[in-house]
C-alpha cells in the first residue's frame, strides 16, 4: 500500500486538528479543507490514478465532490469517476466566510455552479449540502446525525444508504458502492 502525506506548515505543525483546547474552531478550517481537497486531487492526477469510485468521509472532504464534478470533470482520472460521500454529525460551526467562497473558486468550480446546484453557502449545513449536491451516492455515517441532509439527498434523487448495523457495515457499504459504480438504481 502506498501512503502519501500532504501537509502545510500553517495548517498542521503548530496546532490541534480542528479547534483550540477550549473548543473554539479555527477560522480557517474550511480553507484548509479546500487546500487538502485540491492537494489530493492534484496528487491523483500526477500519479495518473484513475479511480472508479472516490469515497469522501466527513466534512473535511465536503468540497471534493464539488471539485470533481466541476473543475476536474474533464480530467482523465475523474471524467468517469463516481463520488460517494459519508455524512457524520460534526460540521464546522462558523458560517461561511467571504474568504471561503473566494478560495473555493477554481476553474469551473464557481459561485454560479454552486447557485445552479441550489446550495446556499450561508446556511450552517452548507458544506454537507455541497457534498450531497455533487455526489453520486450518500452514506449515513452516524445514525440520526444528518437527517436533514439525507432528506436533501433524497429530494435530489441521490441514492442513499442508511447506517447499517455494525456487523453488516462492510457488506452494505460494498453493495452500495458497487451499485453506484455500476450505475444501477439504489
Where are these regions (language model features)?
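Catalytic cores of nucleotide-sugar-dependent glycosyltransferases that transfer UDP/GDP/TDP-activated
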Residues: 1-186
Amino acid at each position: 500500500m502506498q501512503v502519501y502525506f500532504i501537509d502545510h506548515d500553517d495548517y498542521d505543525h503548530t496546532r490541534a486538528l480542528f479547534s483550540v483546547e477550549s473548543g473554539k474552531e479555527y477560522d480557517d478550517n474550511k480553507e484548509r479543507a479546500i487546500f487538502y481537497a485540491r492537494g489530493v486531487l492534484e496528487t491523483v492526477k500526477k500519479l495518473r490514478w484513475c479511480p472508479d469510485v472516490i469515497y469522501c468521509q466527513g466534512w473535511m472532504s465536503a468540497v471534493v465532490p464539488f471539485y470533481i464534478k466541476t473543475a476536474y470533470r474533464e480530467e482523465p482520472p475523474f471524467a468517469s469517476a463516481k463520488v460517494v460521500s459519508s455524512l457524520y454529525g460534526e460540521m464546522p460551526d462558523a458560517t461561511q466566510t467571504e474568504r471561503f467562497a473566494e478560495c473555493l473558486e477554481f476553474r469551473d468550480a464557481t459561485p454560479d455552479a454552486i447557485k445552479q446546484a441550489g446550495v446556499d453557502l450561508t446556511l450552517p449545513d452548507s458544506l454537507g449540502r455541497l457534498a450531497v449536491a455533487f455526489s453520486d451516492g450518500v452514506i449515513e455515517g452516524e445514525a440520526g446525525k444528518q437527517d436533514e441532509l439525507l432528506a436533501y439527498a433524497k429530494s435530489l434523487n441521490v441514492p442513499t444508504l442508511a447506517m447499517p448495523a455494525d456487523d453488516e457495515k462492510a457488506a452494505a457499504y460494498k453493495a452500495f458502492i458497487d451499485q453506484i459504480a455500476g450505475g444501477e438504481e439504489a
